[in-house]
Amino acid sequence: MGEYGIAPGQRVAVIWDSSSPVEALKGLVDAVQASVGADSRVSVENINQLCQSAHRESSFDVILSGVVPGSTAQHSAEVLAEIARILKPGGRVLLKEPVVTESENNSQIKTAAKLPAALTLSGLVEVKGLQKEPLTAEEAQSVREHLGYQGNDLLIVQIEGRKPNFEVGSSSQLKLSFAKKTSPSGKPSVDPATAKLWTLSASDMNDEEMDLLDSDELLDSEDLKKPDPASLRAPSCKEKGKKKACKNCTCGLAEELEQEKKSSQPKSACGNCYLGDAFRCASCPYLGDACLQAWREDPAEREPAA
């Protein structure tokens, strides 16, 4: 059947509904069977039983739905999803459905714009309208009887969609190469004029006509003065209270505190502190310490007596 693009050997499904005339359905099935050949079987399914038929995935090359002359089938989202499931990758669906020109409340009939969108949402691609024409008197009467629509703004639309050339959820191995890419044998050519522009030779450096900037001229007398250590102290160093040098102090406070610590070390007045508590004064700061070998001014250098 050149009208529907059916070729010999293809598997075809014809979907009908209660509004399809029996004789017209039989004539369509016979014509499709003649086109595909005796070796191929044509499946005939009622639109209300399609989801319960449990066809295997990717079973049909072509699906014809609602194309029976006089049919007023309405395709729900579930029916369209099932059609997309049982189509083979790259398979085609051709359907007819009555639509309204303007959307109305409480109407189960789609508009001409919503029908292609419904096919796209079901997973079909390359959706395109093939034909749009007014209903015949018989088709309009069938719509009133089976769908209960009494309006006069109906059109019959013939639309086509295609399933993508892959299954939903399918995977494919990617060919990845982790080998190092070989660099080209020859270096890219460089424009001599560009190279000369960005090249400063030694002769240019010694050229008296070259006006080079002396970096020392960028400094004034204030920059060459040694700063006062007090001015380098962090703000926290100037706070009231106990002085405490920062870690890795660079302002000189650490050295100042160390010097104060050394100067505040107690000194022996009698010279007998190293002999032990028996020879120490009552106010001796070393009471309780072990005997010292020899008196040294620096307490860090004192060693207990052997």
Swiss-Prot record:
Highest taxon, organism lineage: Eukaryota
Positions annotated to bind [2Fe-2S] cluster: 237, 246, 249, 251
Positions of the UniProt region annotated as Fe-S binding site B: 270-284
A cellular-component GO term for this protein: mitochondrial intermembrane space
Region (N-terminal SAM-like domain): 6-172
Keyword 4Fe-4S: yes
GO biological process: apoptotic process; hemopoiesis; iron-sulfur cluster assembly; negative regulation of apoptotic process
Sequence motif Cx2C motif 1, residues: 270-273
Location of region: Fe-S binding site A: 237-251
Listed Gene3D superfamilies: Vaccinia Virus protein VP39
Compartments reported by the entry: Cytoplasm; Nucleus; Mitochondrion intermembrane space
Molecular function terms from GO: 2 iron, 2 sulfur cluster binding; 4 iron, 4 sulfur cluster binding; electron transfer activity; metal ion binding
Linker: annotated segments: 173-224
Keyword Metal-binding part of the UniProt annotation: yes
Binding site for [4Fe-4S] cluster: 270, 273, 281, 284
Motif Cx2C motif 2 positions after renumbering to this chain: 281-284
Key words of the record: 2Fe-2S, 4Fe-4S, Apoptosis, Cytoplasm, Iron, Iron-sulfur, Metal-binding, Mitochondrion, Nucleus
Record remark on domains: The twin Cx2C motifs are involved in the recognition by the mitochondrial CHCHD4/MIA40-GFER/ERV1 disulfide relay system. The formation of 2 disulfide bonds in the Cx2C motifs through dithiol/disulfide exchange reactions effectively traps the protein in the mitochondrial intermembrane space.
Subunit architecture: Monomer. Interacts with NDOR1. Interacts with CHCHD4.
Function: Component of the cytosolic iron-sulfur (Fe-S) protein assembly (CIA) machinery required for the maturation of extramitochondrial Fe-S proteins. Part of an electron transfer chain functioning in an early step of cytosolic Fe-S biogenesis, facilitating the de novo assembly of a [4Fe-4S] cluster on the scaffold complex NUBP1-NUBP2. Electrons are transferred to CIAPIN1 from NADPH via the FAD- and FMN-containing protein NDOR1.
Family to which this protein belongs: Belongs to the anamorsin family.
Protein name: Anamorsin
